[in-house]
Design a protein with these regions (language model features):
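Catalytic-core regions of core metabolic enzymes
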Residues: 1-638
């Protein structure tokens, strides 16, 4: 038996860690006593510390925070499932199911306890090995940022896999993932809460503030964090990133012996935006010598059924493909054996890998059961065997995106070369960064609109200016293509009458008269997010953007390349080209304007919390862009 002590004071020496397995209501008193006796670390399994709006639990959590602040005690949890240290073979976990996990290079941080255990088991079954793994729970004290920082400094860890439900300290998290990026330790992040219901569930589970999914993804892109959508994908990506190779580009080759798989992957590649270029003529000529007559030498490559049973020849074909200068990553068809010695030679896969410095993975068309024989085969082959073609596409895209972010680095704000009065109008700040509006004038009443319109030049647009007409289209406060002074006056008077009829107390400050500008309507804006800072949004469609939700997001600052990526993410990006007889749009001018808005933010951020240009009119190539409507929200208004 083991000797039991009644309290901390009775212990013969100070302890490093207290694993707390007592009711929640007793924990603050016990840990206060322990801290006074020299306890410095505690792990708390219990819940009821404020999750889901529990007031009594919140008071209990506040008591624990006070103990931490007064004594320096560090707490993991509460509401967690413990931690595992594979290098030291230490297990602080309430069940024995995770015993025997293999040592490896993946560090794991999950806020969810039950999912944590399940994912560790499934990852190990797929051949993942772990350094450290922690279920962070409510993160009352230590949080995901702390654990990521620890893993960045740990020599055993090469990849960090995370599942986040909420964010306790956004600034600390950004600093931690930036350190990981600088150390070339990829952080793979599965974030719960894409939907409003998912955000509410995450908040009630951990008590942490659930952030907007688009903003969180923008944070990931800025700091090289790899966003992940499913638990399965987190395993596939952990395997691929653990292999340690990054591509020089995003071009993928698929080598297999199934025509059906070839067609399926082409569908997936088109949907997911996977680049699959043709092989060079030289490569195709060499391939023709190795594959069956009549089999196309195109990418994806179906070598024909004959090579399915002649794997040394199949491996030679894969090596040829891997040498093609048009290709950055190679996936070869392969299924793990269910029994030792039943199929294949793992050394042939290793030879394919060793023939190139490009990432090489194997792919299975569907998920399969993987046992000890399969794991041993994968280890001997030296490459990850990815399951299911959609995960293959997602994983290879993620490798390319991470490599591209490493090439670009994390952009700083450009030094502002524009000298402006700190109290300059928002429009003047934007103009200093190359963003200007159409010729315009202001009339304080409807009667004066006609003369002002003459000065601007017809046709004109007239817009009501009123605190009660922020979204002008919703109150019919915009009139377009007015061709005479009389039309302009009548339109102004009509929109004023409509607003006052709908809201008798409304204040009509006047009317903005603008020269009509042709072009494609785009929305671009910046919002100061309370968690992650300034967020840029770019979308196509003007007033339709809210209905279509076709918007890309980034954290500031952005570069020309970042804006190009944002444009490519838009579903309606085709309208910027030669679309249905229209001339191609001035994309270069649009990119320059969006970067200009990004660069203007440091001069504006102390005064305003939001700025929106909607619409920004994008002219034909060479015609530039015009900010047709600029709206900002001062920090006093927010």
């Amino acid at each position: 038996g083991r000797k039991v002590y009644p309290d901390f004071a009775s212990l013969p020496e100070k302890i490093d860690l207290a694993v707390v397995i007592i009711p929640a209501e007793a924990i603050p008193g016990v840990l206060a006593e322990g801290a006074e006796a020299g306890l410095r670390n505690a792990l708390i399994y219990a819940s009821r510390f404020g999750e889901g709006g529990d007031d009594v639990g919140a008071e209990r959590a506040a008591e624990l925070r006070d103990i931490c602040d007064r004594t320096g005690l560090r707490i993991s949890g509460p509401n967690c499932m413990g931690a595992i240290s594979l290098p030291e073979r230490l297990l602080f976990y309430p069940t024995s199911r995770v015993r025997g996990l293999p040592l490896g290079s993946v560090g794991v941080v999950f806020q969810s306890g039950g999912t944590f255990q399940f994912w560790l088991e499934q990852g190990a079954a797929r051949g993942l090995g772990y350094s450290y793994a922690v279920s962070s729970g409510n993160e009352l004290d230590l949080d995901m940022a702390d654990y990521i920082n620890f893993l960045v400094d740990d020599d055993h860890t090469r990849v960090i896999a995370c599942m986040a439900e909420g964010v306790s300290r956004p600034d600390a998290l950004m600093a931690a993932v930036e350190r990981a990026f600088e150390a070339d330790k990829p952080v793979l992040m599965l974030k719960v809460g894409h939907s409003a219901a998912g955000q509410a569930a995450a908040q009630s589970h951990t008590g942490a503030l659930a952030t907007d999914h688009h903003v969180f993804t923008a944070m990931c892109r800025k700091f090289g964090v790899v966003p992940v959508d499913t638990l399965d994908a987190l395993i596939e990506m952990s395997l691929a990133f653990s292999a340690g190779r990054l591509p020089h580009g995003d071009r993928v080759a698929l080598v297999g012996y199934s025509g059906g798989a070839k067609g399926l992957f082409l569908d997936i590649a088109e949907t997911d935006g996977v680049s699959m270029p043709d092989f060079t003529p030289e490569t195709q000529a060499v391939l023709r010598e190795h594959i069956d007559a009549g089999v196309p030498t195109s990418n994806p490559l179906d070598t024909g059924a004959g090579l399915a049973r002649r794997f040394p020849e199949f491996a030679e074909v894969a090596k040829i493909v891997a040498q093609d200068p048009n290709i950055d990553m190679v996936s070869v068809q392969g299924q793990l054996p269910l029994a030792e010695g039943t199929a294949g030679d793992p050394d042939l896969f290793r030879q394919i890998r060793d023939s190139t410095d490009k990432p090489v993975v194997a792919h299975n068309r569907m998920s399969q059961n993987i046992n000890d024989a399969g794991r041993a085969f994968q280890a001997a082959a030296g490459i990850p065997f990815l399951q299911r073609l959609p995960e293959v596409a997602t994983t290879l895209k993620a490798l390319a995106a991470y490599a591209e972010r490493r090439r670009r680095g994390i952009p700083p704000f450009a030094a502002d070369k524009v000298s402006l009065d700190p109290d300059a109008a928002v429009e003047d700040v934007l103009a200093g960064h190359g963003i200007s509006g159409p010729k315009s004038a202001f009339a304080s009443n409807a009667a004066g609109v006609g003369d002002k319109a003459l000065g601007v030049g017809f046709p004109v647009a007239v817009k009501i200016v009123s605190p009660q007409a922020v979204h002008k289209t919703e109150v019919r406060g915009v009139a377009l293509n007015l061709a005479s002074p009389e039309d302009a006056v009548a339109a102004a008077q009509a929109m004023s009458d409509r607003l006052l009829a709908a809201e008798p107390g409304a204040v009509v400050e006047g009317f903005l008269i603008q020269q009509m500008v042709d072009g494609l309507e785009v929305i671009v804006g910046v919002r100061d997010d309370p968690q992650f800072g300034a967020v840029l949004a770019l979308g196509i469609g003007g007033v339709m953007v809210e209905a279509m939700r076709d918007v890309a997001f980034r954290l500031l600052p952005v570069t020309d390349e970042d804006v190009g990526d944002m444009i490519n993410e838009l579903r309606a990006k085709a309208v910027l080209g030669a679309f249905r007889g229209a001339a191609p749009r001035d994309v270069d001018a649009l990119v320059a304007a969006v970067v200009g808005l990004s660069n203007s933010w440091p001069a504006l951020q102390d005064r305003i919390s939001d700025i929106e240009i909607n619409p920004m009119m994008v002219g034909a190539e060479g015609e530039g862009v015009v900010a047709a409507d600029i709206r900002s929200l001062s920090r006093d208004q927010n």
